[in-house]
Amino acid sequence: MQGDPDVLRLLNEQLTSELTAINQYFLHSKMQDNWGFTELAAHTRAESFDEMRHAEEITDRILLLDGLPNYQRIGSLRIGQTLREQFEADLAIEYDVLNRLKPGIVMCREKQDTTSAVLLEKIVADEEEHIDYLETQLELMDKLGEELYSAQCVSRPPT
């Protein structure tokens, strides 16, 4: 089934974003684990896997539309050197996604590609949940201070 070139372009742009996010979140999770924030690292790693599922769904859609998924392109990673910087970097990538997808969903509907629009709406819903989580972490960091917030993220050995 031949897909619209504009829809395929949008899907490949989003694929690039997902591939970038996978790597950024995965590296952040490994850094967090190395710093001793194992529970936080597990959450960040799960976010990386969520982005991988998005990439898989987008890849499947591109292939169904007789397009070629571009796995050779990846955006610049924004790697934070502190928890705050990591949250801010991850938040920035999520807002980039929303700014691309919201008008993209409208375009898909205008091109009569409801299935792609629904897929992208699902991704937007997932990203909005992640934005809420990241904003909450930054708010907690502001209220508690970075040291107390960080202390809450350290895993305690079992007793």
UniProtKB/Swiss-Prot annotation:
Ranges for domain Ferritin-like diiron: 1-145
Cellular compartments annotated: Cytoplasm
Alphabetical list of InterPro entries matching this protein: Bacterioferritin, Ferritin-like, Ferritin-like_diiron, Ferritin-like_SF, Ferritin_DPS_dom
EC supergroup of this enzyme: oxidoreductase
Top-level taxonomic group: Bacteria
Single Gene Ontology BP annotation: iron ion transport
Phenotype caused by lack of the gene: A single deletion is slightly more sensitive to oxidative stress (cumene hydroperoxide and plumbagin). A double bfrA-bfrB mutant grows 40% less well in the presence of an iron chelator, is more sensitive to oxidative stress, has significantly reduced pathological effects in guinea pigs and a marked reduction in its survival in human macrophages.
PROSITE patterns with a match to the protein in the record: BACTERIOFERRITIN (PS00549), FERRITIN_LIKE (PS50905)
CDD domains named in the record: Bacterioferritin (cd00907)
NCBIfam families, sorted: bfr (TIGR00754)
Name of the protein described by the UniProt record: Bacterioferritin BfrA
